Each structure stands twice: as structure tokens, then as C-alpha cells.
Design a protein with these regions (language model features):
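Solvent-exposed loop and capping/linker segments of extracellular ligand-binding repeat ectodomains
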Residues: 1-152
């Protein structure tokens, strides 16, 4: 079953006309899938079903924005790879992803994020991996500094 997924953009559509990550997998209940709840494009909470063993999401270079609520409640994810091209993450973009144990940031400069982008992340458990020489930039950024485990 699917454990790792590499995508150019973590949603359906384009950055201008996106829906959320769950839309990639659909709303049909399946015992081999894990149910998550995300807001759909109209703002209504919808149940989506992700592969039960999906634990790693890699976002390819070229993605510049992770939209608001895009990965909301994707608690199945254990590892997230963010490209160097990423410069912004929307409100609650990764909200509810409490299962994350590692976030790999390729950008030397911290992406611009909202105060609630990482809400529900366990900052004392999730390791933030950053490029060589950029630890201090992440530690000094008001929204990234809650991560107690920052490694180069």
C-alpha cells in the first residue's frame, strides 16, 4: 500500500484554484483508508479517505505556496518534505497534523506562515530539519521558533 507520495502541489487543481489534499483521494469510505475531516472549497467540513499507510509527503521544488487548510487534519503523516521554493504557508495549512515526527525544510529562509499554521503540531516531538547554516534564522522567526528540535 502507498506509504510515500511525491506531488508537485499538495492539493487538487492549481495554487489559484485548489481544493485540499483530501480531494486527491476522494470521499468514498473504504476500510483500507483512514478518514480525515477537511473543509471543502465551500468551507463545509467533508470526510475524505487517505491511504492507511501513507506516512511521507514530499512536495516537489517549484511549489511556492501551501494554501490555507490544505493539509488540515492529515494526522496520518509522519514526515513532510518542503521545497526550497516554498515561501508561504496559509492559515491552518498543517493544522491537526499531530502525527508529524519530521519536517524537512529545504529553504534557507523560513517561509512566511500564520500563527496557526502549525497548530496541534507537537513541537517537542517533531524535528525540524533545516539547511546548513540556517538554524538561527528558524529559531529567531516568531512562528518557527516553537520547534524545540531544530537540526541541520
Amino acid at each position: 500500500s502507498l506509504k510515500t507520495l511525491t506531488v508537485p502541489f499538495p492539493a487538487c487543481g492549481t495554487p489559484a484554484t485548489y481544493s485540499n489534499f483530501g480531494e486527491l483521494f476522494g470521499t468514498t469510505p473504504d476500510t483500507e483508508m483512514r478518514k480525515i475531516s477537511q473543509d471543502n472549497e465551500t468551507g463545509k467540513e467533508t470526510n475524505y479517505y487517505l491511504p492507511r499507510n501513507l506516512s511521507v509527503l514530499r512536495i516537489l521544488e517549484g511549489c511556492e505556496v501551501i494554501p490555507s487548510k490544505c493539509l488540515m487534519n492529515c494526522f496520518v503523516l509522519k514526515e513532510l518534505h518542503l521545497p526550497a521554493s516554498l515561501y508561504m504557508m496559509g492559515e491552518k495549512a498543517i493544522y491537526g497534523c499531530a502525527g508529524l515526527k519530521n519536517i524537512y525544510c529545504q529553504a534557507a529562509e523560513p517561509a512566511s506562515i500564520h500563527a496557526d499554521t502549525f497548530e496541534s503540531i507537537r513541537f517537542n516531538v517533531c524535528r525540524l530539519h533545516v539547511p546548513q547554516g540556517s538554524t538561527e534564522k528558524y529559531k529567531q522567526d516568531k512562528h518557527w521558533k516553537p520547534f524545540s528540535l531544530i537540526e541541520e
